[in-house]
């Protein structure tokens, strides 16, 4: 014995399937059951059928994602504690080094060595300040110190440490090449 709701649902599905078969639209999935499709190319079923309430069971059920993007060559995994990392080999944990990161690290350490520490604010070069002072002292104002005295008072003190022998920024102007190919003489950096 069928109820009225069953008859309506069955009638609707039969009419819907008949309409899909008789129509000449390009969409094949309207009105068809996608579970009956045997050519499921993009569907993946997990062999795990248990509850997913624990993190370990969830990790087992999910497929392992090998890379974040096509440029990332390593594996990505989060750790709750450092003791979990002891079982993995070091090569799986380290990020491979490329030329850009090595050059950036070398320039950063050289900049720290030249300035005598990490500075968050850019400072004016001693040479530029002494040239401005020298221009104003040549105008006849004797109250300002001469260029040589000013240079001696503003020369940064050098510290010997893990960076080896450092040279003041003023004594070693460097030439950098920009992306456009122009040379820039940089005294501060």
Curated annotation (Swiss-Prot):
The terms describing its cellular component in GO are:
nucleus; plant-type vacuole
Q: Where is this region: Disordered?
A: 22-49, 128-147
User: What InterPro entries would the database entry show?
Assistant: OxStress_Response_Reg (IPR051992)
Q: What Gene Ontology biological process does one annotation of this record name? A: response to oxidative stress
Where does it live in the cell?
Answer: Nucleus
The reply on keyword Nucleus is yes
Provide this UniProt record's keywords sorted from A to Z.
Nucleus
Mark out the compositionally biased spans (Acidic residues): 33-44
> What PANTHER family does its record include?
OS08G0516900 PROTEIN, PROTEIN OXIDATIVE STRESS 3 LIKE 2
Name of the protein in its database record: Protein OXIDATIVE STRESS 3 LIKE 2
Which species is this record about?
Arabidopsis thaliana (Mouse-ear cress)
Q: What is the lineage of its organism?
A: Eukaryota, Viridiplantae, Streptophyta, Embryophyta, Tracheophyta
């Amino acid at each position: 014995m069928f109820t009225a709701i069953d008859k309506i649902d069955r009638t609707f599905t039969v009419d819907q399937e008949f309409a899909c078969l008789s129509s000449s639209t390009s969409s094949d999935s309207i009105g068809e059951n996608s579970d009956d499709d045997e050519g499921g190319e993009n569907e993946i079923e997990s062999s795990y059928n248990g509850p997913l309430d624990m993190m370990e069971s969830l990790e087992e059920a999910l497929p392992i994602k090998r890379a974040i993007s096509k440029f990332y060559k390593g594996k990505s995994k989060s750790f709750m504690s450092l003791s979990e990392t002891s079982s993995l080999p070091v090569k799986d944990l380290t990020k491979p080094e490329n030329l850009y990161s090595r050059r950036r690290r070398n320039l950063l350490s050289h900049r720290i060595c030249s300035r005598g520490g990490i500075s968050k604010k850019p400072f004016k070069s001693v040479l530029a300040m002494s040239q401005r002072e020298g221009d104003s002292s040549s105008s006849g104002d004797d109250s300002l110190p001469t260029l040589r005295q000013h240079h001696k008072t503003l020369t940064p003190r050098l510290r010997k440490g893990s960076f080896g022998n450092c040279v003041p920024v003023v004594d070693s102007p460097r030439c950098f090449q920009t992306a456009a190919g122009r040379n820039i003489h940089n005294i501060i950096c």
